[in-house]
Amino acid sequence: RSFAKSTSPYDRNQLWRHSLATAMAAERIAKRLSLEADGSHFSAGLLHDIGKVALDSVYPDNFQEAVKRAVESQRPLYEVEPEIFGMDHAEVGGVLGEHWNLPPLLTEALRRHHTPDQAMLSPQLAHVTALANYLAYVAGYGESSNVGEHAYPMSSAMALKMDPGKFQDIIEELQQASERIDAMLGAVSAA
């Protein structure tokens, strides 16, 4: 099955905007920390919510029910998904990463972007992804199912030894990149 089309009312465009913003934030965090520029941070940010796309594509009615429950109960989607699917979108993303033979460090970042303290192979990549996810939300790149998912990831900031004062410039860069993100999405959807 292709992930390109969705029959559900879930706003896939907002998800991709958020994913691109998360990728850009992850890349900037990695640069500020002088981490290797190997593309893994950008890739983890871009793909971190791929499990949502899979769940929405394969089980659109169930996914909409999960989104509805999350909104109504004011809980994060990743807490509601296991009630319906037996696992959350992060775990689904990890399963997809394994199926696609993605590097294990990247697969772990997909699986642990909400639970970076549980990462074993590369806690650093998982923490960068979690923090980038948060910064993308703060910069205004969210979606309707993000209820509660944008809590400040204190453990990630501490693990990365990043001063929260350094976040504002990343947030501002993301806000200024809105047109560029929309252009990237337009180019992809036109292809």
Task: Locate each region found by the language model.
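A glycine-biased, small/acidic residue-tolerant capping/turn segment at secondary-structure junctions
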Residues: 142-151
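Terminal helices and disordered tails flanking the catalytic cores of nucleotide-processing hydrolases
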Residues: 154-191
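A short hydrophobic/aromatic micro-motif that marks alpha-helical segments and, especially, helix-coil
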Residues: 63-64, 117-118, 148, 178
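Acidic/His-rich, divalent-metal-binding segments that scaffold phosphate/diphosphate chemistry
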Residues: 1-98, 104, 108-112, 119-132, ...
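Residue-level signal for threonine
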Residues: 103, 153
